[in-house]
């Protein structure tokens, strides 16, 4: 059966998309809007190879594989053993089992040993500074930068990104300024920015960024509302995610 013909069965133990299923009961971070936003938005050009840093359940990896119609190899790197096993199972059950490869590895070590270079790197990274521990060490690792600092992440991506490649991330709005200041100090350049709000009455809470190692002029900025005044999905959000959500 081809990828285009594949229709996943509805199941209660994860999240069913139009063309694949994500089980996430062994992953610290469940399927959520952040990952869906990044997987649907990350700009695709003429990609040769894609890297997903901290892939979790492999959600973003499989979204990108779908968008590329399985023509572009995707390496999905995940430090947590349980999450990496589940990610590999999700990939194996998808139409892109021959396209996406899950690596149980630390991205710092992976970036030093992989022979590949990437035209696109994506990450939904840890974003909180060390604080009150979460209920499980697995969730603490996924949420706090003590497991992967933003500086280490930027250095690791720099080591494997092609000269004209792009690094795309999704971050909480309150830390974007510090992240961009750090990135610029490490010779990264902002290419694209999207400020995301839940609805017109709510402030921006997430930001999508595309960074390059070559200066880009001009920098493109835009805004995205997830829901409208009536709390229905906005036309822009529907257009962005309609290839994935069953309800769209």
From Swiss-Prot:
Q: Which GO terms describe its molecular function?
A: nucleic acid binding; tRNA (adenine-N6)-methyltransferase activity
Signal peptide bounds: none
Q: Which keywords, in A-to-Z order, does the entry hold?
A: Cytoplasm, Methyltransferase, S-adenosyl-L-methionine, Transferase, tRNA processing
In its UniProt record, which GO terms are filed under biological process?
methylation; tRNA processing
Catalysed reaction(s) here are: adenosine(37) in tRNA1(Val) + S-adenosyl-L-methionine = N(6)-methyladenosine(37) in tRNA1(Val) + S-adenosyl-L-homocysteine + H(+)
Q: Could you say which EC number(s) this protein's record lists?
A: 2.1.1.223
The record's family statement is: Belongs to the methyltransferase superfamily. tRNA (adenine-N(6)-)-methyltransferase family.
Question: What is the documented function of this protein?
Answer: Specifically methylates the adenine in position 37 of tRNA(1)(Val) (anticodon cmo5UAC).
Which named protein is this? Answer: tRNA1(Val) (adenine(37)-N6)-methyltransferase
């Amino acid at each position: 059966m081809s990828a285009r013909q594949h229709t996943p069965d509805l199941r209660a133990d994860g999240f069913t998309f139009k063309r694949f299923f994500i089980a996430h009961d062994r992953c610290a971070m469940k399927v959520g809007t952040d990952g869906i936003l990044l997987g649907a938005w990350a700009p695709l050009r003429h990609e040769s190879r894609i890297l997903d840093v901290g892939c979790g359940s492999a959600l973003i990896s499989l979204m990108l594989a779908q968008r590329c119609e399985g023509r572009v190899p995707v390496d999905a790197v995940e430090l947590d053993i349980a999450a990496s096993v589940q990610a590999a199972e999700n990939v194996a059950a998808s139409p892109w089992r021959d396209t996406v490869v899950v690596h149980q590895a630390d991205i710092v070590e992976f970036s030093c040993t992989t022979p590949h270079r990437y035209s696109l790197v994506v990450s939904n990274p840890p974003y909180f500074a060390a604080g009150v521990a979460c209920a499980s060490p697995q969730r603490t690792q996924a949420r706090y930068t003590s497991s992967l600092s933003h500086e280490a992440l930027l250095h690791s991506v720099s080591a494997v990104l092609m000269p004209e490649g792009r690094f795309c991330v999704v971050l909480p709005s309150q830390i974007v300024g510090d992240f961009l200041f750090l990135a610029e100090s490490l010779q990264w350049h902002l290419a694209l920015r999207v400020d995301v709000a839940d609805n017109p009455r709510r402030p921006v809470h997430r930001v999508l960024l595309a960074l390059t190692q070559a200066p880009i002029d001009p920098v493109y900025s835009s805004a995205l509302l997830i829901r409208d005044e009536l709390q229905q999905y906005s036309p822009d959000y529907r257009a962005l995610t309609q290839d994935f959500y069953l309800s769209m």
